[in-house]
Amino acid sequence: MEVREISLAATTPLATDYINGTFPIEKGFSYSLQAEDVFWRRLDDIKGRAYPRRELVEYLRSYHQRFHASSETFYNIEKLLHPESVVVVGGQQAGLLTGPLYTIYKIISVIKLAKEQERKLGVPVVPLFWIAGEDHDIAEVNHVYIAEDGKIKKYVYPDIPQEKRMVSDVPLDHQVCSTWITNIVKTYGETETTNKLLDFLFQCLDQSKTFVDFFASIVLRLFASEGLVVLNAADVPLRAIESSFFTALIECHREVTDAVLRKQHQLRQLGYKNTLDIQPHCANLFYYDGRQRWLLEHDPQKEVFHSKKGEFVFSKDELIQLAKTKPGHLSNNVVTRPLMQEFLLPTLAFVAGPGEIAYWAELKEAFSIFGFKMPPVIPRVNITIVERSIQTDLAEIGIDIMDVFKGRLEEAKQQWLAQQTRYPLEEMFAKAKAEIEEIHRPLREFGMEIDRGLAGLLTKNATLLQAQIDFLHQTLQRALIRKYEVELRKFSRVEMSLMPNQAPQERIWNIFYYINKYGFDFLEKLLQLDYKWNGMHKIVYI
């Protein structure tokens, strides 16, 4: 594998400016990416903090035993008992088969940064992945994209409940899921890895009752030798550890909301669009009734917390009592999840995607309410994999990969096609249509002088003539495409691989396509690459 770095804008302007060093750091973050001592400073800032280390380790031991996690993972869990140990954390929803590639890249980023900083700082650093099991947006995680008959298809897991159930509580039907997996892997083609891959996935499925179980089982096996630790944010035993901070979030709900709204206003004044949809009445917590999450709002007149349509109503004391006795009924939203993470974990760094970078900037003042400093926010690695066959296609059609990323592939294809004939078709047909119109116009005028009632017929006749020219143009264009079908297919293959659906590769394709084709050591090779935390896009040639 070879790596080439290129500069590409992030998907949000704020993330682009943050990565490039042009965002005013103090306006949205506590640490600068450009500071060489950023991790030493962070280590110093959190060394006096108290964390629920023993409770967390007991929970993590129990959770990982369910998945028969590796000895390396249990070794890393025990590290958390060390008073100076810290974590590098990143998180994502529990996509089926791990979802798009960027989830895998985020895990790789967490692992690589943890190893690097353990070596540099001389303290234990644990790679931890926060699974957003409390999320209820099933449509985000219930599918995988596949390539079939030259087209991109969204292949959806069919057995989904209708309620807004937390992903961690969405059950998997093993028979339905086995068929779903088999059909996906079939589209990858038969290789010497295929049977091993199916066995791997079915073993993970056997350990799993829910979407989150399946995700956790897969990533713990894929990264077993790296000692990855995972945390299911929706797990009831974890909620017991979070109980006291839920109480703090209830007590300070208004201050949190006001802090976010103020920060959003400041960022708008700097020219950045807000990412979070938050209103003054938001309580930033959900109530979970066991089947559905209900976002809570606060009514200052009645001094109650309630779901939008009043299905559930709580006084402040009732909600605090719930946090103390039944914390499993409470769930964080996008604002309070990072705060809960900071309460739980001695976080050296948070590995983030571009969207997360943008919305975390809106949370800086919310962190300070609880005496926290936002951890260093480190952009995850962005990767595009270029297979050897795609590299060959690019060379043969004479296209630079930047043309693909800049959305110029279709334009390049049309230019290439135009160069294959000595006749400039577009110009010829445009000229023909103009000349026919010039000839026909005086005929229409003459007809109108004879009988103005012929206006409709004369116009229709002109339209038919132009339509015939268009028909001939399209016929010749199709013939040209047929003649160069082999060459044009190369453009399609390049687009399908590198920018499917005009989206970055890492947002569409799944890691198991590549594992099926190149073997399980494909992931090990990705892990062995030297990644620089500079925000540059990595093109990996294989």
From Swiss-Prot:
It comes from the Bacteria. Its EC number is 6.-.-.-. Keywords: Coiled coil, Ligase. Residues 458-479 form a coiled coil. One of its GO terms (molecular function) is ligase activity. It is an enzyme of class 6 (ligase). Belongs to the BshC family. Involved in bacillithiol (BSH) biosynthesis. May catalyze the last step of the pathway, the addition of cysteine to glucosamine malate (GlcN-Mal) to generate BSH. This is Putative cysteine ligase BshC.
